[in-house]
Amino acid sequence: MTSPEQVGVRREATDAEARALASGLRLRILRLTLDEPLTNREIAEALGLNPATALHHVRTLVDTGFLEALEPRRGRRGAREIPYRSTGRSWYMSTPVGASSLLEAFLAEIATVPEPDRDLTRLGLRLPAAELEELRARLWELVQEFHDRPRDPEAEPWSLFVALHPDTSQRPRRSP
């Protein structure tokens, strides 16, 4: 049987998957472990967490299949440590509660990026429904195209955050 991940199709997350992805901290753990497996200790250090707190989140991600445990290795002082790597499954999930956790993860990550290294823009639009759908489709196709390209382990890692939403800063238009 072919999984949605194998054919590149998004699917609705189960309740457990949606709960796992509803945490900005868990999304940051997935990002940290996307290209390099990290132990619980390394994850805790990278995020400034207590190792027990990190382990709680790691276990949730392992239980839902978003992280996989690799072969144990010897860490500092010969202790047995388990490295974890992101499975990439979260890309193929659609959740009704994911937007706030995505924003939470983005804000935490962008706060650590020096101002000159940020490339941000905002754009106000007025589009008819058909053009709005065209914009959504073209944005999705572009992002999916870059997602599907082979990852170059030697390339510098970058992050992309895209948000399209109704503009609530505009005053309502008056009727003629």
Which residue ranges define each predicted feature?
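C-terminal regulatory/oligomerization modules of transcriptional regulators
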Residues: M1-Q6, S90-A105, A111-P176
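Short capping segments at the starts of secondary-structure elements
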Residues: G24, D35-T39
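Residues within the helices of the helix-turn-helix
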Residues: L30, R41
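A short acidic, leucine-rich amphipathic alpha-helix
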Residues: E42-G48, L61
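Key DNA-contact positions within bacterial/archaeal DNA-binding proteins
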Residues: A52-T53
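Short hydrophobic beta-strand motif reused across regulatory alpha/beta modules
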Residues: L67-E68
